A protein has these predicted regions:
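Expand to "…catalyze enediolate/carbanion chemistry for C-C bond making/breaking, isomerization
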Residues: 1-130
Length: 130
């Protein structure tokens, strides 16, 4: 096998691994089981890509949802109800935890840092209702 063939095979493997990580993240699997050290840079890139690519739309979803006092909302073709509130918050908690999202970026959701740090959508709603 010549070096250009090897390069093509390696790049294909990288793309495949990157796409598999993105697929898992989109379906809620935030933990990975990388078996080889060469997979770690790809996971790092995929995790950052996932959080940064979704930052604007997820910020808008959570801000809109909170603005309507957690009533069911429809943005485009995405329907959010109370059951998704914690999942939207978790997106920001995970993104902040890994360093892909800055706390100041999370404030675009309309939540304060103190609210985000409660880690509980239920507590945020209770705090806003009192």
């Amino acid at each position: 096998m010549c070096s250009s063939d090897l390069k093509r095979v390696v790049h294909h493997a990288w793309r495949l691994n990157f796409n598999n990580v993105i697929h898992s993240l989109k379906h809620g699997y935030y933990q990975g089981w990388d078996l080889h050290p060469s997979q770690l840079p790809l996971r790092y890139a995929a995790v950052y890509s996932f959080f940064l690519d979704g930052l604007a739309s997820t910020s808008l979803r959570l801000k809109s949802f909170m603005g309507k006092a957690a009533q069911a909302t429809l943005i485009g073709d995405v329907f959010d109800d109370a059951a998704t509130g914690q999942a939207l918050l978790n997106y920001f908690l995970q993104g902040i935890s890994c360093g892909a999202i800055l706390e100041k970026d999370a404030e675009k959701t309309g939540l304060t840092l103190d609210e985000i740090r409660t880690r509980s959508f239920k507590k945020i709603l209770q705090g806003r209702q009192s």
